[in-house]
C-alpha cells in the first residue's frame, strides 16, 4: 500500500488504540484474550490499532512474538481498521531489517518508529535513523516522539524535515500543546499529527490535529468519539465538558507507570489481560483500589 493510500485510510482513524498485550500467569502471550478485547474496542469506536507499541510492552517482546501478534490481530480485524505495527528500536540496522520483514506481510498499513532510546543521538542522528527506516521498504512510517520515555526528543523542526520524506506520513507527538500547534500549522498538506497524550486529545483536535493514539480508549472510546463529534460540529463548550469529565479518569490511568493501570482496569472488567513482564510490575492493591474507584466514579 502506498503512502497516499495509507494516509487516506488514516484520515478516517481519529481514535487509534495502542493495544495491550495479554499475558498468562507463566508470562506467555494469552492469544485467547484478544478476540473479546478487540471486538469490544471496535464496537466502542476504536478506528485503528497500534500493535507492539509501548502499551504492548514492546521492549519485552521478541520480534517473533510481535509477528505472532500481528498475524493474530490481522485475522481478528480482517481489514476493518488500519493496523500499525511497532517496528522501531534504538538500533537502526535492526529497525531496518524488521520493517522489511513486516512490510512483506502485506496487511500492515504503517510502521510506528520510536525515537532511539538510550543512545541519545543528535538531531542529525535522529534524522538519519528515521530516513534509513523510511527508505528500507514501501511501508509508510509514523514517527513516535515520546521524550518522557526515551529522554531524547525529536525537535519540531526535525519532524518538519522528516515530513518532507515521501514515506513519512504522520507523527505521534507526546509533548506539549505548543509543539502540537506548531506542527499542525507547519507540516506539509496530508501529513497527520496525532497526540499520544490522552489528556491532550481535546487540545489536539481543536487545534486541527487528526486525533489521538490512545491508552485510555481501551475504556473511554465512546467518550473520545462523542468529544470529537462535538468538536467537528463546532460545539466546543460541549466537547470541553466531556474533556473535563474524563480527565480524572485519564490521570488515574497514568498514576503509575503505564500499562499497569490500564491492565488493572481491564482485568477488573473481565478481559483477562494478565500481568506485566519484568521489569514492569502490576499495581499494588492500594494503587489498584484507587485507580478502579476513580474509573468507576
Curated annotation (Swiss-Prot):
Keywords: Amino-acid biosynthesis, Cytoplasm, Diaminopimelate biosynthesis, Lyase, Lysine biosynthesis, Schiff base. Its EC number is 4.3.3.7. InterPro entries: Aldolase_TIM, DapA, DapA-like, Schiff_base-form_aldolases_AS. SMART domains: DHDPS (SM01130). Pfam families: DHDPS. Its main location: cytoplasm. The active site is at 144 (proton donor/acceptor), 172 (schiff-base intermediate with substrate). It comes from the Bacteria. One of its GO terms (molecular function) is 4-hydroxy-tetrahydrodipicolinate synthase activity. GO terms for cellular component: cytosol. Transmembrane segments: none annotated. It catalyses: L-aspartate 4-semialdehyde + pyruvate = (2S,4S)-4-hydroxy-2,3,4,5-tetrahydrodipicolinate + H2O + H(+). The keyword Repeat does not apply. GO terms for biological process: diaminopimelate biosynthetic process; lysine biosynthetic process via diaminopimelate. The record marks 54, 118 as: Part of a proton relay during catalysis. Pyruvate binds at residues 55, 213. Pathway: Amino-acid biosynthesis; L-lysine biosynthesis via DAP pathway; (S)-tetrahydrodipicolinate from L-aspartate: step 3/4. PANTHER family: 4-HYDROXY-2-OXOGLUTARATE ALDOLASE, MITOCHONDRIAL, DIHYDRODIPICOLINATE SYNTHASE. Homotetramer; dimer of dimers. Catalyzes the condensation of (S)-aspartate-beta-semialdehyde [(S)-ASA] and pyruvate to 4-hydroxy-tetrahydrodipicolinate (HTPA). Belongs to the DapA family. This is 4-hydroxy-tetrahydrodipicolinate synthase. It comes from Lactococcus lactis subsp. cremoris (strain SK11).
Amino acid at each position: 500500500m502506498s503512502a497516499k493510500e495509507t494516509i487516506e485510510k488514516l484520515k478516517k482513524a481519529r481514535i487509534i488504540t495502542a493495544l495491550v498485550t495479554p499475558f498468562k500467569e507463566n508470562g506467555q502471550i494469552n492469544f485467547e484474550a484478544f478476540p473479546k478485547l478487540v471486538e469490544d474496542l471496535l464496537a466502542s469506536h476504536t478506528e485503528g490499532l497500534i500493535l507492539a507499541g509501548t502499551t504492548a510492552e514492546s521492549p519485552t517482546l521478541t520480534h517473533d512474538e510481535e509477528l505472532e501478534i500481528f498475524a493474530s490481530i490481522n485475522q481478528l480485524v480482517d481489514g476493518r481498521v488500519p493496523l500499525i505495527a511497532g517496528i522501531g528500536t534504538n538500533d537502526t540496522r535492526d529497525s531496518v531489517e524488521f520493517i522489511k520483514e513486516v512490510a512483506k506481510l502485506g496487511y500492515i498499513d504503517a510502521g510506528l518508529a520510536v525515537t532511539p532510546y538510550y543512545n541519545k543521538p543528535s538531531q542529525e542522528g535522529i534524522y538519519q535513523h528515521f530516513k534509513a527506516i523510511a527508505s528500507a521498504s514501501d511501508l509508510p512510517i509514523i514517527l513516535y516522539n515520546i521524550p518522557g520515555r526515551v529522554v531524547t526528543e525529536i525537535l519540531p523542526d526535525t519532524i518538519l524535515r522528516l515530513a518532507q520524506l515521501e514515506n513519512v506520513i504522520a507523527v505521534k507527538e507526546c509533548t506539549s500543546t505548543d509543539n502540537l500547534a506548531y506542527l499542525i500549522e507547519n507540516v506539509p498538506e496530508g501529513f497527520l499529527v496525532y497526540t499520544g497524550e490522552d489528556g491532550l486529545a481535546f487540545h489536539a483536535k481543536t487545534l486541527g490535529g487528526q486525533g489521538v493514539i490512545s491508552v485510555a480508549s481501551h475504556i473511554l472510546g465512546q467518550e473520545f468519539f462523542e468529544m470529537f463529534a462535538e468538536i467537528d460540529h463546532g460545539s466546543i463548550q460541549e466537547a470541553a465538558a466531556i474533556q473535563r469529565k474524563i480527565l480524572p479518569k485519564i490521570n488515574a490511568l497514568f498514576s503509575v507507570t503505564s500499562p499497569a493501570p490500564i491492565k488493572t482496569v481491564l482485568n477488573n472488567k473481565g478481559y483477562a489481560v494478565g500481568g506485566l513482564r519484568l521489569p514492569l510490575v502490576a499495581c499494588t492493591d492500594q494503587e489498584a483500589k484507587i485507580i478502579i474507584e476513580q474509573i468507576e466514579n
